[in-house]
Amino acid sequence: MMLPFHTAKGQSIYPDVNADGRTSIGDVTALIQYLLTHDGSEGFDASLRGQISVKDYGAVGDGVVDDTEAMEKAFDAAARMHVSLYIPAGTYIIRRPLTLKSGMEVYGDGNATIIKKKPAVWHKLTQVLAADSNVATVDGIDGYEVGDAMYISDSSGNLTNGNGAARDCSYGVITAIDSVNNTVTFASSLNHAAGHYGAVKNHAVDCVLSTSYAILRSWSKDECIGVYIHDLCLDGNRQTNEPMSWCNGCIHFDPYTTANRSNVVYRSHTYNHIIANCKIINSSFDGISEQGEGGLYVKDCTIENSAMHGVHMGTVFSNAIISGNTMTGNTVRGAGVFFCQDVSNAIIDGNTISLFNHGCSDEEYSTAGTFNIIRNNQFSNITSYVFDFLKATATARGGGLVITNNKVTGLKNSLFAGKYLDNVVFSKNTVTSVTTMPTELIKVTNSDGVVIMGNTLPSGANVSTPVNSTNSTNLV
């Protein structure tokens, strides 16, 4: 008789220890031996109850002790044993991202369970760094430790206010520090950082070596499918003036891909993830970043003080529900919900979004995608356009967009701006107060099949063009 594992969701998973696609007596024997001899509480009790705790692997959670190694062991064990990982109340300090793998459930005691990054250290590089280099020279090495996670990212020459564009980002682990020559050696090459669209680049002098990193991350050649994260507080511990680091959202899913503007080839896959009842604060980039194929459900989360976006969906992404969340930005940049490069079949419903540059946006380099619904949300004190869909082009048109029944307070710029959009409905939206009266409330240009009706909009002498529909056709 063969006993299966039982997960928290009641699923039965028969162990395939040898990863050969078959379950055999040898597998079961190896599993029993492993359960009896492995350090920690990985025994029959752990497998039968369907969960393990990070405390079983030595995590302290006192906000002082570095819990990185203990947390890594617990994450690895949970993935290996197909059991849930419980993180009890406490503050767990880490200095490297914790790796998510397929089928993992990670949960805690709500806001009482905090995973917090060690404060980031960064220095501007003093030399041009080749794309395959393993050694970086920095102006100073104070604050670095062997074993730290580190990234190379573009600072855009603007370290004083943290406006770094953070392109060409590379991840490694510091393996050696030479205090004589101010050099840092790290494991792994930089060719993942070949550029957003696959063009090989050298890292110029205006790049930064930074210990900023994601907290929970899937970024490898391994598949990551069906992760469930809930009831945790993740603190990115972003420092004042810290340069942004792309790929360093508090939760970051990113498959190994080869990509350009017209073609995306996945070398691994990531999809079907649930994030619920989490508090995500002080991120070095996005609160949640999902760069995989799709299938994302973010529900009842609080996201505060992200350096960039609240929730970021991208790279030919489809099928998402972002519902019931409260997102607060930093007024300078980013969007509450960011549609990046052809997002389709996303429902943005019942969220409260404030203090971002945009409420919902395809800002940067994407089209608007198709068949997206933005409804029943509350937006307040958005610095620029509340709904910004201006990045579609004549040759890569967006469309199938429904924006309805949203409420906006503290309007400072245009309510809705879009171009090269087809089949758009903008209806029953209400502006309840205005901070700065824009000259154009709605701007939809070079578009076809646009319905604008039933909205409650402000009026005033400064509104010279309530609706700008230049070069648009079939406008209702």
Which residues make up each language-model segment?
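Parallel beta-helix/beta-solenoid
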Residues: 23, 101-103, 107, 134-160, 169, 179, 215-247, 268-281, ...
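Alpha-helical segments with a strong preference for the paired helices of cellulosomal dockerin domains
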Residues: 14-47
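Short glycine/acidic-rich loop motifs that flank beta-strands on beta-rich extracellular proteins
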Residues: 83, 95-97, 110-111, 116-119, ...
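Autoprocessing Asn-cyclization modules and mimics
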Residues: 113-194
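Acidic Gly/Asp/Thr-rich repetitive segments characteristic of extracellular carbohydrate-active
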Residues: 54-88, 142-147
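Beta-solenoid repeat scaffold
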Residues: 84, 95-117, 176-178, 200-203, ...
